[in-house]
Structure formats: C-alpha cells, structure tokens
Amino acid sequence: MKYISTRNKDKVVSSSEAIIQGLAADGGLYTPQSLDQKVDLSSALKMNYLELAQCILSLFLSDFSHEQIQQCVQNAYQNSFENNEVAPLCKYHDGWLMELWHGPTSAFKDVALTLLPHLLTAAYQNQNENDLISILTATSGDTGKAAINGFADVKNTAITVLYPEIGVSDIQKRQMRTSLGNNVEVIAVKGNFDDCQQIVKEAMKNPVVLNACKHMKLSSANSINIGRLLPQIVYYFDSYTKLVKSGDIQLGDAVNFVVPSGNFGNILAGYLAKKLGLPVKKLVCASNSNNVLTEFIRTGSYNANRAFIPTISPSMDILVSSNLERLLFLLSDHNDVLINQYMTSLKEDGHYTISDELRHALQESFTAYDCSEEECKKVIYDTFHNEHILIDPHTAVAVHACHAYKQESNDTTPCIVLSTASAYKFAKDVYAALTGKSCDDEFETMYALHDYTSVAIPKNLACLKDMPIRFTKVIEKEDALATIAKRLEDLQHDHN
C-alpha cells in the first residue's frame, strides 16, 4: 500500500514515510492510493480485538513486518483499557452505544493514540532514522491528553500540544496541565481550535520553524496524520462482529453508524471500513450548533464564514474540518486539481461548493443532523433517567442525530452510536443537565455527579485533583510560530 497527497497524487510515499511526515509538504493529507482489498468478515468473526487490529493494519502498512505490527498492537492495547476491552457495546433503546472511552484518558482518541507512538517508532526503524521526532498537536480537548499519554518519555520523541485557552472543559484542561513526561510541553492559545489547528499546519511548512528543526523530524499526532486514522477503522469492524456473534444481526446485514463529528476523522474511518467491505448503509454525521458539516452534507456547500459558537460539546466546536479533504479526494477519484481548487477557495474566501455529481456520491454514504444546546441537555437527561445510562455531551449529540435520522428516514437498519468520552470529562455540564444545579469546582461536581448517578469515576480522572499543575503558558496566536520555533531550538540543543 502506497500513500498519495490529496493535493498532488503524483507524490507517492510508503506508509512509514506518511506516518513520519504527518502532513505532505504541499499541505495535502496522505491518503491510501487504493482501497481494493477487502476484510474477510467470516475470518474477522474468529478474531479478538488485537487480532482484528493486526489484520486490518496489515492491509495498510505494507512496509511493516508482521512482527512489527503485532508488537505495536500488543504494546498499545494489552492492559491499557478497562477489562481489556477496547470498545464494549451497550444496548439502549435506539440501538447500541460503542463505548470508546475506557482507555487511559477516558476518550476515544486513546484507541489511536496509544498505538501511534509505536507505529511512529517502527516507521523510524524502517526508514533507518535516528533523529529526534518532534510532534506538534492541536487539540480541542481530548487529543492533547491522549497524545501526551502516548508519547510521554518515548525515546527520541518530544511532543508539544496547543489548546484553546477558552473552550475546553475544566477537566480536559487539568488533564493536560498536570501531564507527566520530560519530553512534554503544553501551551494555551488565545483563540479557538481552528486557530490551533491552522498553527500546526502552518508550522509544518514555515521556513523559520523548519530551520529550527534542521536535524529533527517534524510530525503531528492530529488526524491529519494517517497513522492516527487507520487504528480507528478497527472498532467499526469489531462492533459489527460483536453483533453478529450475539445474534442481533446476521453476517452480511447492513448497519448504520452515528458519529459525533468535528474534524471528520472518526467518521472517515467508518467510510474506510465500508470501502474494506463492512456492510454499512449510512454514516450519520452528528454536529452541534457549529453545523457547518450538516449544511455541507445536505447541500454540497461548505461555508466557514460564520460565528464560532462555544458549546458544551467543545471537541466538535470546529469550523474548518480537515479530514473532509481526504473524503472529497476519494470520492472524486483522486482529482487533486479539484481538491486544490476547493482548499484554495476555503483558505481565501472561507467557502466552496462541490459539483452535483460529487454531492450525490457524498450522500450515498453520508447523511447529517445537528443538535442545539437544549436538545443536547435533554438527551443527557432522558438517557440517564429513562435508561440509567450516563453519556457525555458529544455522545448526546450523536444520540439525538440517531433519533432524528430514524424519524426522518423510517430506516429500521440497526444503528451503532459512537460514544466518544466519559461523562466525567464534562462533569459540570452533565450534572447541570441532569439536575439543573451548577457547581463551580470541577472536582466537587465530579463527586456530586457520582453521588447522583452511582456511576464509577474513571481512575485517571479521580486522581487529577492531587496532581501538581506543570504547564501554565498562555500565548497570543500571532506569537505561536515563534514560540514553536524556540521550543524546537531548545529541543535540538538538548538532544545534541
């Protein structure tokens, strides 16, 4: 399997090169050159999660040995998740919740980011590299801590995380600011997630930044890195095989997946699963009040020229959705000229409109719904009080979308909703939605939520209160590139 840039399909690299580089030099995203291979579902039924991960990753990592992939998967997933189950399913009235938050930082990003450091290290071995790898990562809350957890004190790596000063939950902020690891830096930016993400993209090709890291590699742990995306394909297959084995569906039956979406990486992994032969009828894109994706999927027009709305589901507070570029590249049969036109229009004018042909291709696999703040809170309330299932605001947005889709389409196909974070990461908003009460202290709220629901607090969150805060730096977004360059210079000096 080779990888090509969405902005120059003649730029062909190996999987190791794609993972190390993160972003192509032309600003494009590395995408599989072909998706002709299929996963044998009958064989998949006989596999546990680790075996399934090895099977699927082997299709994409052709320059990795079988032993390398096996070792990466075992190092990532053995003993890292509660009860050694990466993605358990929970039945609820409209279908199933795929609980992706039982990892070390209580968010779905753990599934990919426990594995990415091992993939990156193996890729380095394959390329006979021994320079320092500096990881730049923008986060809307969950990616940051999951990436830090994965890369902390990993040999020959350093990680720098940028997060918006306002817009992440108190618990998410505390998770990042108390992080351990001698190779870690965490910086708050006076801006939103789109600003942070743009800074990372600009840094990857900025001459001053690149000059500061002449003797190291610059990469990213965001979903712009294909190594972040590939591990997420696995849990789509895993959930399907679980339903077949439980007798809830027959092998070959179609299912729908409902995915809370911001940067579009998680739902794109579902589309890649479909291309590999998973019987997916619809991928339902769930958005909050920042409904640029809903509008795009329904109309074919992408318009980022709108007010940025901070919500109680901050990981979806995004106006520029990076992985959409990969999807359009795939749907347009690798039309890099078209992708360049769209991305230039987005950068210069803040909007673009795809052709009717491309919109029809998009709507064959995708549909979309958005959710207001009040609707989100009501779903949190109803899901707990009617079914005693505690969900976070992002999952609530997806549960709302699942119900709306069923109501509008009358589709009886089984639905699997991706539950992406522990409710305790957003304790203040969840507690307020359930009780109508507010509490200023995040830990008091966490304990109050536990007292109210009797749902266990994840250990990694319960211990946060006693951990010292290490990182307090806050910068203007205009100073970000200079700050990154200085960080890289210091890393280079220390490494030498």
Cite the ranges covered by each PLM segment.
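PLP-dependent amino-acid enzyme catalytic core
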Residues: M1-N496
